[in-house]
Each structure stands twice: as structure tokens, then as C-alpha cells.
Amino acid sequence: MPPPTAQFMGPTQAGQNESQNQSSGEAGEQNQEHGQGPTPILNQSQPASSQPQHQQQRNESISYYTNFNQPRYSTDASINSFLNISDNVPVTSTGGPSSGGAYSNLPRLSTSSTHQPPDLSQIGRGFSIVNNLFPQQQQLQNQHRQQQQQQQQQSHQQPPFKTPSFSTGLTGSSSQYQFLPRNDNTSQPPSKRNSVYLGPNDGPDFEFFSMQQSQQPQFQPSSRRESNSMRPPLLIPAATTKSQSNGTNNSGNMNTNADYESFFNTGTNNSNSNQNPYFLSSRNNSLKFNPEDFDFQFKRRNSFVRGTLDHSSQNAFIPESRLNSLSVNNKANGDPVADNVTNNMKGKSNEVDNDDGNDSSNNNNNNNNNNNNENNNDNNNDNNDNSINSATSTNIPNQEDHSLASTDTTSNSRKDLKEIEQRLRKHLNDEDNYSSAISRPLDKNDVIEGSEGLNKHIDESGMQPNIIKKRKKDDSTVYVKNEMPRTDPPMSKDNSTSAEGAAMANFSGKEPPIPDISSVSDDATNLIGATKVDQLMLIIQARKKGFTEKVNTTQDGDLLFNQTMDILPPKSELVGGVEKPKGTQNTRAVKKHECPYCHRLFSQATHLEVHVRSHIGYKPFVCDYCGKRFTQGGNLRTHERLHTGEKPYSCDICDKKFSRKGNLAAHLVTHQKLKPFVCKLENCNKTFTQLGNMKAHQNRFHKETLNALTAKLAEMNPSENIPLEERQLLEYFASIYKNSNRGIKGRGKGVGTKKSTISSPENHPASTILNPNTNANNAIANDSENNGNPEGNIDSSSNSNPGSHSMISPTQKDMGTLQSQFIQNNFNNSVNSSNPSNQPIINYNYTTLPHSRLGSSSSSNTNNNNSNFSVGAAPGVLMAPTTNNDFSFNLDQSNDNERSQQEQVRFKNINYKS
């Protein structure tokens, strides 16, 4: 291959080329103003005959070692789409230049009859004027054909995410340019060659990001230079169409939020007809997301992104917690900045419900708006403008029907929560007025009653809709979500040295308060006798305590009894829970903190503090989903897993997941093929892995048998004998269902919401209560003066000597001796006795401990004379004289007499890490 030869031009030709370069430079600058970038200059060669050139070979020149005339591989056809090369001269009718206009010097790729195909190898990166010093050689035809074939393939089959350039143009008119007039005179940088350009017809290529066809803009700039500059995302909470519709504020200055207002206000007509709300808030080449793109299944209802991208809303979404803080907290603190923000937000709608009693507050809000030069023509007496309009509210997006609760309701609820905390402190510190200091649960009256009584009902529309849907129908407590700030809870796990704990620690050795019936929530009471098994266990527990009165039943097997009868367990025992396993004295800590209600002992003051909450109904932890309250934070977290679907516990064998650790433990039994629970009703002998499954089985398939056993045991005469089989069956029920009727939510459909089926005789006038024992003991139990005594103790009017009736602890060693002495004596002739003081009252080892103010030393009650000794009992338990009729069957488990009193009191299973 011979070395290339360098060719030089004469002075005349050099001057022509210099003038041509200057003119082409001016044309390039002109094209640069129209968004085309620098236009490449082609050295169109003239015939050799018209322009004679002086050629001279210089082998020692640098051109001897330089390859200028070979094709440039850097401008390969694979990167042609990135180069600013036009395929043809634009021919448009809407302002584009014609073929003979100022843009006729653009290079062409297509062949014509008058011009030869240009050499594209010298156009690209590293373009230099040195290339024009040498004559061009003919380009190979095969390379040109290859470029044409590749361009045809690109025009017919474009990839979904293409890299278009100015050579391809818009989709549908790839061979034309569109030069549109500029709308502004601001100096902006030129467009980049490799920027992604999305035209209005590029929707099919970007189906995931494409918008609706009805919302396609009719106007689209030719490049990014025609759009406004990119600004960082900004949320404008107080933009209104009244004051900013023309893009100017009251002072006459340009409004900087006009672009963002046009982004959210799709229906407003701006002064500029070419302005499009979808493409003016940012650069035209950026990707826009439509709210329908996020309309998938498991989205959040109050999504922050969805509220921002929703074009139907009049403003950006404001988080509810932030909105509450602006409307309540900052307003109360008197912050002038917060007041201005609140007044701006209330320009079109206030956060106060439309009520006749709130006209003065609405007028004040309108006056504040007049001071801020907004809504100057508002009528102070127009309540419709002051009410919250769900269609035109500028504060809250209404696609999910969110609305704010009334400020009065929020303040009233917060006031009620403070009153509960004050009542708790007063209750724990006061020792004289026990009955007045008892706290009661938060009911509807507490939430509804305000300081002036303006609001007589709670507007359900002001509450969160998801709370209303998931709330139980029979729930007697109304809770409003996020009314109390979660930053300052009434009680927390770190508040171990609080005033409540210190006050409860001072209860040792003092008289505890008497818990009122109304002070305990009815949730635990409704669980008593919920099923047939529970009703049978209720009468078994009553007979176990020594209750011998006859109780009538209905045709359906429901129990009928008076409130004075001691069938129902005391309120202090309706705390639920499962007893912890027994331990030794060395492994368990000394329990020195005593509960003033049930006299249970705890090793730590914080344990006692949590335990007392269950007695007084104080539940500071609220579920944000359904409004249910809990006494412990751990129980709340476990409950919230039902809403969130979280299941952190998984089985190692089958990988099944559970939300509770106890459910996992019950599931592991199924893999071990163990079924410890056996149904003994009617010789069924069906085995079960869980007790709840057997209970549901018995309530469904052995309902008649349970009704027969309940009726027989309820109407049994003390003189009758119990057959051996029935006694064993009763002992079987008493052993496996020992935690029944203690306020624990059991298994089965509708157990948690079902009211107790036990009714009183007043509701059934046709039924009569047969009292075979009309002695003085029953007179004491049915005495009208004794009804006010929640403990059911002996009436003081029946005996002038209160010291003659003393109580014996159920954990004392001589309890078995007293029972044996009592049973061995013959009391057949004392049924009609008129001396109630001689009738013994025995406590059959029930769970609660005696009150210290009613008891005395048990050493004085060890007299063997039956007429001189009288023992105490559990609250309201009266023991009628019995005969030797085998009725005194033992349903209690064996107790270790060597254990101390502190060890025998066990507390429920509490998650103390909450």
C-alpha cells in the first residue's frame, strides 16, 4: 500500500475556504439558537478542471505518517443515532423552514441526482478544520448501503427504550424537523445530544408510564430547551386557586408556585394557551407517573406518594399527625406563625364542624382571613363556607374519605384521659374515701360530655372509617384515633418509679378499698356462662364453694338466679390469665407487694402496677386500627399482628407461621401425635390435641347431656346422693376446666361478643325459685340491707358482736380439720334454727385471700365447740347444714400444706417487657 500523499491549495482557494468557514460558522450559531446544535460543514469538492490545484509530494511531511483519508472507525454505524445528522430537510407547514430557507445547508443522508453522497466518516467527535485541507475521496458504496439498511431497521423496529436523537425526530415523522417558536427569551443552555426525548406519540413504547389518551397534550416542544428548568420537588400546603389563579399574588409579583399549582390544578385555564399542567412543573423529558399506575392491590390507603400524585386533589397531601399539630398544638401555644398557617389553611374550609353553637369561633376565623388579604368578601354569617366541604377541601385529600375530628371532641377526650389518670392517682393515694375514689372505665358518657355540653353525640363521620368498620357492634366504649399524642403516654414501661407504683407500694398493711361492681368493665362479666360447658362449670364452682341453694333453669338449660345468690364469682377474680408453673422457694423471689383488691402478692412493684390496671379498667394502650384498648403494651403489639398480618413464629417442621408463641406451642403437639384431652361424655372417648377443640366439640355434639347435668346439679337437694359415675364426671370437668368463668376469652364462634346467657328470675316471671332452706342463712343472703355489700359478708344488724364472725384463710393448715369437724357434726335439727350466729360459714379454699380488716387471728378459732366458734368465708358464701349424703365430694386439687401463704398465691401470665 503506497503512502498517502498530501495535497495543498493555492492562496485563492484558501481564501474561499476561509470565507466559507466563516459563513458556515454563522449558520451554525444560528442553528444553535433554534436548538439544533452545531451544524457540521461538508467540504463539497469541485471538479479538478474548474479549480486547478498545485500538488507537491512531501515525503518528509507529517502527513506521510498520518492516515487522514481512510474511513474513521469511530463514526461507526452503531452510534449514528447519537450524532446530530439530519436525514432530510424538514418540510413543515406550521412554522418550519422550507427546502430553500435558511436551513438548506444541512447535510443529507439520502442520495439525489445532483449531489453525491457526502463522506460521513469525518463528522463526529474530534472534528477538526484540518480535515478540510485535503480533498475527499469517494466513500465505499457497501458502507453506505450498510448504513441505510441499519437506519431502515431502526425506523421500522424501534426498541421500547430507545435513545432517539435529532436525526430521528418525532415518532411518525422521522424524516422531518419541527421548529417551533420560542415562548420566552431567557437564556438556557443548549440541549444535550444524548438526552432522552419523549414525544406526545411515544405512549405505546412506554406503556407502563403512559398516561390516558384523553389527557394527552396537544402541544409538545421540540426539545428540552423549550421547557422550564427542573426544580426540586416541593409540597405546597396552602395553595389556593382564588389568590393564585393568575400566577401573581396580591402585591403584583410573580408567584413562584404557579408551576406547582398547575401541576395539581388540571381544570384551571391559564393565560398561556400552550401551558399544559402535566409538563410545566418539570422538564419535558422526565418521566411522569399517573395515580393509576400505583393502583395495585396491597397499597396503603393514606399513601403519601398517592396523595401527592393524585391530580384530582386540590393540594398536596398533608400527614394527619402534622395537620393535627398545626390545628391543635400550635394553636394552643399561641404561636403567630402557626396561627398564620392555620388561617391560610382555613381560607376555604375550617376544621370546626358546622354547628350553631360555634358561630363566634367561625366569625373569628373569617376576621383572621380578612387580615391576611384572603377571602375579603366572605360573609361572617355564612355557615356553609365554614363547614368542611368534602369536594373542595384544600387541606385533606378526600379520595379515602378522611376527615378530621372536631377540635372540641379532641379536647374533651384528652381531658377525659387526664381525668382517668388523676382518678387513678387519687384512688391509689386516698385511704379514707374508698368508694368515691374507684376509677371506672372510659365509657361513652366520658367522651361525649363536654365542658359546655355543646356536643351531645359523636359524629361518626369525623372518625376514621377503618375504625368504624372494624369496631364491634356491642362495644360500649368509643375511642377516637390519634387524639392523644403518643409521645407522652400515661404509663410506659420505663415508668417503674412513677407515683402510681410508689402509692401502691404503700398499701402494705393498710385497709384496701372495696371494689365496686360498676368499677370493673363488663367485658369479663359477659364471658361468664357463655357456653354450656361454662354454665356447668359455674354451678360446679358454686357447689364447690358450699352453695347449696336450689337454682332453677329454663327450658334451654340456662341458669336462673338472683343477683344476691353467690353463683357468680367475685369481680376481683375476673382478671383472667393462666397461672404460672409452681417453683421452689429458692428459685422464686419473695413477694412483698400485695394487691389491695384480690390480695395477690407480687415480687415487683411494676408487676403490681400492671395488675391493678385490670381491676380498675385502666387501659392506656390503644390500637390504631380498631380502637381497642389494652393494659399492657405487649398485648397491644400482639393484637396489632392481627391487622398487619405479621407472623414471627414459624414451625421448624412444616414452616407454618403463627402470630402468637402459644399457638406455635399448640401446633407442635400435632407433630408429636399427642392427644391428651379425651371427651368422656356419653362414652365418646374422642381425643383432641387442644382443650379448646374439645370444649367446642362438647358444646356442639353433647349439648343435651350438658343441659341435663347442669339442671340436675342446680336443682339437687342436699339430702340426695350423687352417683359415683356422675361424681367422677364432675371431678373430670372441674379438673380440666378450672379456668372457666374467669373472664378469659375462650374458643368458639362468637364467644368474645356473645352476652352471657345467664338471666335473672325477674326476666322470667313464669319461673319460680324454690328455696328449700328457709332458714336464717338464706334470710341473711337475701336481706335488702346486705345487697349493698359487694363482699356478701354477714349483715351487721343480725349480730351485734362483729367480732364473733371471723374469717379463716383458705391457706391455713387447720382448714381440713375444721371441715372434718363440721361435717361430722349432725345438723339435721338446725335447719329451722332461728339463731343465725350459730350457723357456721366455711370458705372452701377459693382463690381470693381474705381482707385484713375483716379477719382476725385464726388461733382464736380453733375451739372444738360448734356453738362458740364461727369461721369466715369467701365473700358471700353461705354454708347450709348438710347431712352425711356423700355430697361433700372433693373437687379441689391437693395442696401442699408446707408451703407458705406467699407461695400459694399465683398471678396471671403477664408480659412484663411491655
UniProtKB/Swiss-Prot annotation:
Protein keywords: Amyloid, Cytoplasm, DNA-binding, Metal-binding, Nucleus, Phosphoprotein, Prion, Repeat, Transcription, Transcription regulation, Zinc, Zinc-finger
Gene3D superfamilies from the xrefs?
A: Classic Zinc Finger (3.30.160.60)
- Where do the segments described as Polyasparagine domain lie? 362-386
Q: What is its main location?
A: nucleus
Expression induction per the record is: Expression inceases under non-fermentable growth conditions.
Composition-biased stretches (Low complexity)? 44-56, 138-158, 206-222, 245-275, 359-390, 771-782, 796-809, 856-868
The record's listing under SUPFAM superfamilies reads: beta-beta-alpha zinc fingers (SSF57667)
The membrane spanning regions, by residue number, are: none
Name of this chain's protein? Transcription factor AZF1
Organism equals Saccharomyces cerevisiae (strain ATCC 204508 / S288c) (Baker's yeast)
Q: What is the lineage of its organism?
A: Eukaryota, Fungi, Dikarya, Ascomycota, Saccharomycotina
Gene giving rise to this polypeptide: AZF1
